[in-house]
Amino acid sequence: MIPVRCFSCGKVISNYWDEYKRRVTDGEGSAAVLDDLGITRYCCRRMFLSHVELVDVLSPYQ
């Protein structure tokens, strides 16, 4: 699960995650997708680029 807000500036970013993930999986470049979604702050961009989905990895240990 991606955090709801950017850790640095507090901008809501979670509503863009599904669109970002779908478009990058389809082969579009990360920078182009983030530009198109209007994610211009470097702190918010880092949230997308560095995020790793761990829900599937951690769910067996509940």
UniProtKB/Swiss-Prot annotation:
Main location: cytoplasm
Localization: Cytoplasm
Glycosyltransferase is among the record's keywords: no
GO CC, any one term: cytoplasm
PROSITE patterns linked to this entry: RNA_POL_N_8KD (PS01112)
Gene3D superfamilies tied to this protein: Homeodomain-like
BP GO annotations: DNA-templated transcription
Residues reported to bind Zn(2+): C6, C9, C43, C44
Note on cofactor: Binds 1 zinc ion.
Top-level taxon in the UniProt lineage: Archaea
Reactions that this protein is recorded to catalyse: RNA(n) + a ribonucleoside 5'-triphosphate = RNA(n+1) + diphosphate
GO molecular function, one term: DNA-directed RNA polymerase activity
Cofactors required: Zn(2+)
Keywords: Cytoplasm, DNA-directed RNA polymerase, Metal-binding, Nucleotidyltransferase, Transcription, Transferase, Zinc
EC numbers for this chain: 2.7.7.6
One Pfam family in the UniProt entry: RNA_pol_N
Biological role stated in the UniProt entry: DNA-dependent RNA polymerase (RNAP) catalyzes the transcription of DNA into RNA using the four ribonucleoside triphosphates as substrates.
The family this protein is said to belong to: Belongs to the archaeal Rpo10/eukaryotic RPB10 RNA polymerase subunit family.
Subunit structure and binding partners: Part of the RNA polymerase complex.
UniProt name for this protein: DNA-directed RNA polymerase subunit Rpo10
Organism: Methanosarcina acetivorans (strain ATCC 35395 / DSM 2834 / JCM 12185 / C2A)
Record gene name: rpo10
